[in-house]
Regions:
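Short catalytic helix/loop segments, enriched in acidic residues and glycine
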Residues: 43-60
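Divalent-metal-activated hydrolytic enzyme cores
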Residues: 88-108, 112, 144-209
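Short N-terminal binding/cap micro-motifs at the start of the first secondary-structure element
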Residues: 34-42
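Short, surface-exposed acidic-centric catalytic microdomains
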Residues: 65-86
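Short, hydrophobic/glycine-enriched beta-strand segments
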Residues: 26-33
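Short Gly/Thr/Asp-enriched flexible loops that form oxyanion-binding sites at enzyme active sites
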Residues: 126-156
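Acidic, Ser/Pro/Thr-rich low-complexity regulatory regions
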Residues: 165-336
Length: 336
């Protein structure tokens, strides 16, 4: 039987293969989050996780819409004013309207970003140009609303609806962090497939290796995707790719839960339960139950599952992205 050490080495190879299969992995980011002094007050909002940890695995493409629109640093603070659907970017003290300058910059910058094939984007929370949600918008009479989005972020999401986006503040939540980074790597794999050509056979293989990951997010939509694969002959390749890609990313955006992870782990257990001894099966069921009751993080049952996958040479399970959706060095599943 294969030792735990051999199992660990194989896991390292799988972790490396995630990177080689998806490189280059480019992510957009608000420039201030990298420590550049581009904020209105001349300061920055450097994020250590993004720069020191995730930065080892991605190539950052930094953008500061306000600076690139020619507004300078430091500059007068600005806010969004008017109709929440079509707000204007206005300086707080002098009331100067910079909307047109930012819109021109946005149009030009989005055209540049399209050619860079981004796999995700991290925006600055609350920014009138970069906030994704709950950005403050004021009526003409000064009444405050928090239902807005930054002008640049909103335009980016409209033009690139499949690209995973998140705000740096929300990435402090371990579950949201793991979900975002998982989606980034999945989207990169999807981009690779699209670029190589989406044949029916290639799409079926892509779906197969992502099946358990999809089950952890939304079992019903995983079934819908499976039916789409089964009816691939009814669709033109381009239409099939578009429909699958949209639903694939929509499914992954649904938050995985402990209950759904337990369901997936039990599916995996069922794959080789007849080959497990009584004590081995009891041990695996025990760690799954501990995870279910919040006594251990997800990494604990997964580690034991991976060990048995290697021992029994379960190639179908080994190929599942669910086991290694992102580099283990990020330790994302140590906290969920």
């Amino acid at each position: 039987m294969e030792s735990l050490r051999d199992s660990h080495l194989c896991e390292q190879e799988q972790s490396r293969s995630i990177m080689t299969a998806t490189a280059p992995l480019r992510l957009g980011i608000s420039r201030c989050l990298l420590g550049e002094e581009v904020r209105f007050d001349g300061g920055h909002k450097r994020d250590n996780f993004l720069t020191e940890v995730l930065g080892r695995y991605v190539e950052w493409v930094s953008v500061c819409p306000e600076v690139e629109a020619g507004l300078g640093t430091p500059r007068e603070a600005m806010r969004l004013v008017g109709d929440p659907q079509y707000p204007r970017l206005v300086t707080i003290r002098t009331g100067i309207d910079h909307t047109r300058a930012l819109e021109t910059m946005t149009t030009n910058r989005l055209a540049e970003l399209k050619s860079l094939d981004l796999s995700g984007y991290v925006f600055k929370k609350g920014s009138p140009s970069c906030g994704i949600e709950r950005v403050r918008i004021f009526s003409e009479q000064g009444k405050l609303s928090r239902n807005g989005a930054g002008l640049f972020a909103r335009a980016f999401i409209e033009q690139f609806p499949l690209i995973p986006v998140e705000e740096e503040g929300r990435l402090c939540d371990p579950t949201l962090r793991e979900n975002f980074i998982e989606r980034v790597f999945c989207y990169r794999r999807w981009q690779d497939l699209v670029q190589s050509g989406v044949t029916k056979q290639a799409l079926a293989q892509f779906h197969t290796i992502h099946k358990y990951l999809l089950l952890a997010h939304h079992p019903q939509q995983c079934e819908v995707l499976g039916r789409l694969i089964g009816q691939a002959h009814l669709h033109r390749p381009k239409e099939l790719a578009q429909r699958y890609g949209e639903l694939f990313m929509k499914t992954l955006a649904v938050k995985a839960t402990v209950r759904k992870h337990v369901n997936v782990l039990q599916h995996i257990l069922g794959y080789f339960k007849k080959r497990l001894g009584i004590h081995e099966k009891a041990e695996l069921l025990g760690v799954i139950d501990d995870y279910h009751h919040g006594l251990t993080p997800l990494i604990v049952p997964l580690t034991l599952v991976k060990h048995y996958v290697q021992i029994f040479d379960a190639s179908y399970i080994r190929a599942q992205v669910y086991l290694n959706p992102h580099p283990k060095e990020l330790m994302l599943r140590n906290h969920v």
